[in-house]
C-alpha cells in the first residue's frame, strides 16, 4: 500500500481508534526524548544540530537534529503552530528579521556555519531562496520581476545575458509559454497560480542551490496546485527543496522524505512512504490517521 493509498483509506473509512485527547497528546510529547526514524543522512546539504528557537521567552522549536539531503524534497508536516514554518525560516535566516527571535544550535550549508556572525546574509539568501505562502510578485513587469535578482547580484553584464536568464528561469518554472508574448505586462495581472510560478522563477533566476517553500499552494486552486507539484518534482533534479505543507496528500505526492513536527519537537523523519504507511511514533500515526490535527 502506498502513502497516498493510506491517506485515501483514512479519508474514506471510519477511524477505528478513538480521537486522541489533550492529556494523551501531552503524554506523547513528554515521551519525545529524541527524533525517531532516520533524521541523519549521507549527502547532506544542510546539517542541523541542537537547534532551538525562541520568541522572547517562549520556546518555539526544541533541540532539532536533522540532515536535509542534496537534490531531494523534504516535506515538513504537523498541526498548526507546531514550529515547522519557524524552523524552515532558520535555513536562510529569515528569522533575523524578527527582533524577538533567537536561534541557538548549529546549522551548516555544505559545511559552512550559516549563523557565523561574520556571514553576509545577502549571498546566503541567494543560495537559499524562498517561496512564500501567498504569491508576492513585485509591482513590476513580468520581465522585471525575474530580472531584478540577477541585476542586484551582478549576474548579467549584458542585456542579452539578462534576457537568457529571464527566459531560462520562466521555462524552468513552467511559465514561459504562457507569458512569452507579454513579458512587459504587470506581474500582478497574472492568475494566482501564475503569480506563484513567477515567484518561483524569480527565485530560480539568482541560481540558488536550495529552495524553501512555505505553504506554496495554500492560496491556489486544485489545477494551479497540480502545476506547482509537477514543477517541484522537476526542480528537485537540480535543487534541494524543503516544503512546509498542511496537506498530507501533497507531502506524499511531492517529497522523498517527510519530517513530522509536534509542539516544537521534531518527532519523526523518514522516507515519505515509510512515514505514511508505517510510522514509528504514536503521535505521527495519530496525526496522519486524523485522530488530532
UniProtKB/Swiss-Prot annotation:
Alphabetical UniProt keywords: ATP-binding, Cell inner membrane, Cell membrane, Membrane, Nucleotide-binding, Phosphate transport, Translocase, Transport
A cellular-component GO term for this protein: plasma membrane
Molecular function, one GO term: ATPase-coupled phosphate ion transmembrane transporter activity
Major subcellular site: membrane
Signal peptide (from-to): none
Lipid bilayer topology: Peripheral membrane protein
CDD domains associated with the record: ABC_PstB_phosphate_transporter
InterPro entries for the chain: AAA+_ATPase, ABC_transporter-like_ATP-bd, ABC_transporter-like_CS, P-loop_NTPase, PstB-like
E.C. number(s) listed in UniProt: 7.3.2.1
GO biological process per UniProt: phosphate ion transmembrane transport
Keyword set includes tRNA-binding: no
Residues that coordinate or bind ATP: 78-85
Domain ABC transporter: 46-288
Protein origin, superkingdom: Bacteria
Family from the record: Belongs to the ABC transporter superfamily. Phosphate importer (TC 3.A.1.7) family.
NCBIfam families assigned to the protein according to its UniProt record, in alphabetical order: 3a0107s01c2 (TIGR00972)
Oligomer status and interactors: The complex is composed of two ATP-binding proteins (PstB), two transmembrane proteins (PstC and PstA) and a solute-binding protein (PstS).
Protein name: Phosphate import ATP-binding protein PstB
Organism: Saccharophagus degradans (strain 2-40 / ATCC 43961 / DSM 17024)
Gene that produces this protein: pstB
Amino acid at each position: 500500500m502506498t502513502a497516498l493509498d493510506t491517506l485515501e483509506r483514512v479519508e474514506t473509512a471510519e477511524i477505528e481508534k478513538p480521537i486522541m485527547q489533550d492529556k494523551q497528546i501531552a503524554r506523547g510529547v513528554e515521551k519525545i526524548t529524541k527524533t525517531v526514524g532516520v533524521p541523519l543522512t549521507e549527502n547532506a546539504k544542510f546539517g542541523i544540530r541542537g537547534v532551538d528557537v525562541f520568541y522572547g521567552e517562549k520556546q518555539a522549536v526544541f533541540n532539532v537534529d536533522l540532515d536535509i539531503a542534496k537534490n531531494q524534497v523534504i516535506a515538513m508536516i504537523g498541526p498548526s503552530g507546531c514550529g515547522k514554518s519557524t524552523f524552515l525560516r532558520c535555513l536562510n535566516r529569515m528569522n533575523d528579521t524578527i527582533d524577538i527571535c533567537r536561534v541557538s544550535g548549529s546549522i551548516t550549508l555544505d559545511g559552512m556555519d550559516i549563523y557565523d556572525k561574520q556571514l553576509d546574509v545577502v549571498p546566503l539568501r541567494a543560495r537559499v531562496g524562498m517561496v512564500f505562502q501567498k504569491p508576492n510578485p513585485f509591482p513590476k513587469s513580468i520581465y522585471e520581476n525575474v530580472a531584478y535578482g540577477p541585476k542586484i547580484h551582478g549576474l548579467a553584464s549584458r542585456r542579452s545575458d539578462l534576457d537568457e536568464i529571464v527566459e531560462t528561469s520562466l521555462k524552468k518554472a513552467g511559465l514561459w509559454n504562457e507569458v512569452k508574448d507579454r513579458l512587459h505586462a504587470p506581474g500582478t495581472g497574472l492568475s494566482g497560480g501564475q503569480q506563484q510560478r513567477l515567484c518561483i522563477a524569480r527565485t530560480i533566476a539568482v541560481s540558488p542551490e536550495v529552495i524553501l517553500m512555505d505553504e506554496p499552494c495554500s492560496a491556489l486552486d486544485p489545477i494551479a496546485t497540480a502545476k506547482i507539484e509537477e514543477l517541484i518534482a522537476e526542480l528537485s533534479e537540480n535543487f534541494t527543496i524543503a516544503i512546509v505543507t498542511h496537506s498530507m496528500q501533497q507531502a506524499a505526492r511531492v517529497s522523498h522524505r517527510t519530517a513530522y513536527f509536534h509542539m516544537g519537537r521534531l518527532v519523526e523523519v523518514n522516507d515519505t512512504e515509510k512515514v505514511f504507511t508505517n510510522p514509528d511514533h504514536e503521535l505521527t500515526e495519530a496525526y496522519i490517521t486524523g485522530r488530532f490535527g
